[in-house]
């Protein structure tokens, strides 16, 4: 399990972090989002990959059950992500999380991002949840980036309220990435290594993850399948309404 330590709740607006990365902070193109959504909802691909490297890889790490108060927003089960733009382990996790959430809804104002140019696995291509909005009739999602790409930001993000800070402080190990699945399970750290994305840009990754035999598909689709399974886990309403929850890989992962 890989966890990047955070010493304080430093909340940052990342949209201006373009040093060495012209695309960073700019909206993901509609054509790219459409293609990514097609990958996300390719059930044949998802079932073929299953959990992939998220279980068999060197950094295999699964969500752990907790006994929290059920987490909902407007009556919908809620998923919370906490990370930072500089963090390479958050970078690889965002690929899987975006794909998983696209199986239940869609994003607007999702932007391109790269991890820090000075950290390990420098400049890992990814996305940022800053200023993005998630739309779904059956699931709620909110993503917070605590620190910008240069690891020097200090702009307060008002969305990370005391409510979310308390959830993070209670159930996280103090690091990022952190994902809370409806307060039923939480994931501390990444499920796969960012190394699988090394040397590729966004379009190359998108092309590679369509082929179940590639290392990037085994990692990205594998983690997306893990995230999807834990969104569906122990949720009767979702299992009745969401096609993703009825896929064979979900049953294989959560039993």
Spans of model-derived segments:
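Short pre-active-site segment immediately N-terminal to redox-active cysteine/selenocysteine motifs
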Residues: 83-86
């Amino acid at each position: 399990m890989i966890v990047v330590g955070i010493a304080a709740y430093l909340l940052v607006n990342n949209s201006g972090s373009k040093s060495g990365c012209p695309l960073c902070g700019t909206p993901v193109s509609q054509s790219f989002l459409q293609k990514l959504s097609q990958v996300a909802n390719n059930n044949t691909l998802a079932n073929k990959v299953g959990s992939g490297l998220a279980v068999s890889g060197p950094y295999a790490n699964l969500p752990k059950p907790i006994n929290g108060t059920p987490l909902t927003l407007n009556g919908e089960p809620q998923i919370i992500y906490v990370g930072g733009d500089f963090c390479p382990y958050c970078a690889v996790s965002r690929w899987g999380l975006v794909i998983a959430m696209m199986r239940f809804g869609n994003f607007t104002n999702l932007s391109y991002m790269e991890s820090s140019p000075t950290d390990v696995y420098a400049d890992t291509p990814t996305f940022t949840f800053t200023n993005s909005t998630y739309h779904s009739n059956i699931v709620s999602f909110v993503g917070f980036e605590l620190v910008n790409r240069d690891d020097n930001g200090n702009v307060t993000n008002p969305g990370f309220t005391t409510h979310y800070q308390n959830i993070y402080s209670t159930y996280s190990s103090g690091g990022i990435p952190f994902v809370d699945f409806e307060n039923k399970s939480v994931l501390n750290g990444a499920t796969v290594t960012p190394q699988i994305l090394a040397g590729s840009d966004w379009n190359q990754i998108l092309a590679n993850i369509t082929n179940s035999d590639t290392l990037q598909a085994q990692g990205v689709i594998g983690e997306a399948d893990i995230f999807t399974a834990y969104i569906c886990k122990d949720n009767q309403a979702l299992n009745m309404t969401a096609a993703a929850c009825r896929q064979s890989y979900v049953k294989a992962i959560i039993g």
